């Protein structure tokens, strides 16, 4: 009998493997991405203190009118722009990008490109 592979378990293993190497500091915090079927979430985290400095998602009130559906590339672009503007307002210009075990493609790539265009450096 062939068992179906659980893609989320594989993603979590990849994420843990990468997290052993990537840490965020106060000078260069970690930008973590989580992707669900209907939404996308981003947090900028200082791992030394364990605090979330900035967060944004497709569920934010600022994006309610702009985004009709939260699970597509256009919504990811808007979230990338929003998180970059929030981070720059708090004085964060450089981050370490943590793709969360996801392949750098599609929504993850669009979010990263939009954040770079809006002024974040990674």
From Swiss-Prot:
> Which Gene Ontology molecular function entries are recorded, alphabetically?
5S rRNA binding; structural constituent of ribosome
GO CC annotation, single: cytosolic large ribosomal subunit
- Record-level GO BP terms: translation
- Sorted alphabetically, which Gene3D superfamilies does this protein's record hold? 3.30.420.100
Q: Sorted alphabetically, which CDD domains does this protein's record hold?
A: Ribosomal_L18_L5e (cd00432)
Query: InterPro entries annotated for this entry?
Result: Ribosomal_uL18_bac-type, Ribosomal_uL18_bac/euk
A Pfam family annotated for this UniProt entry: Ribosomal_L18p
Keywords assigned:
Ribonucleoprotein, Ribosomal protein, RNA-binding, rRNA-binding
Q: Where is the signal peptide?
A: none
In terms of HAMAP family, this protein maps to: Ribosomal_uL18_B (MF_01337_B)
The family this protein is said to belong to: Belongs to the universal ribosomal protein uL18 family.
Relate the protein's function as given in its record.
This is one of the proteins that bind and probably mediate the attachment of the 5S RNA into the large ribosomal subunit, where it forms part of the central protuberance.
**Subunit comment:** Part of the 50S ribosomal subunit; part of the 5S rRNA/L5/L18/L25 subcomplex. Contacts the 5S and 23S rRNAs.
State what protein this is by name: Large ribosomal subunit protein uL18
- What organism is recorded for this protein? Ruminiclostridium cellulolyticum (strain ATCC 35319 / DSM 5812 / JCM 6584 / H10) (Clostridium cellulolyticum)
């Amino acid at each position: 009998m062939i068992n179906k592979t659980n893609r989320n378990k594989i993603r979590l293993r990849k994420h843990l493997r990468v997290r052993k190497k990537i840490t965020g500091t106060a000078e260069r915090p970690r930008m973590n991405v989580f992707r669900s079927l209907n939404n996308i979430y981003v947090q900028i985290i200082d791992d030394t203190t364990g605090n979330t400095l900035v967060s944004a998602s497709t569920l934010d009130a600022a994006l309610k009118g702009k985004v009709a559906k939260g699970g597509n590339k256009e919504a990811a672009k808007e979230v990338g722009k929003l998180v970059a503007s929030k981070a720059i307002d708090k004085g964060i210009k450089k981050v370490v990008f943590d793709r969360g075990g996801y392949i750098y493609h599609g929504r993850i790539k669009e979010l990263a490109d939009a954040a770079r265009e809006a002024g974040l450096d990674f």
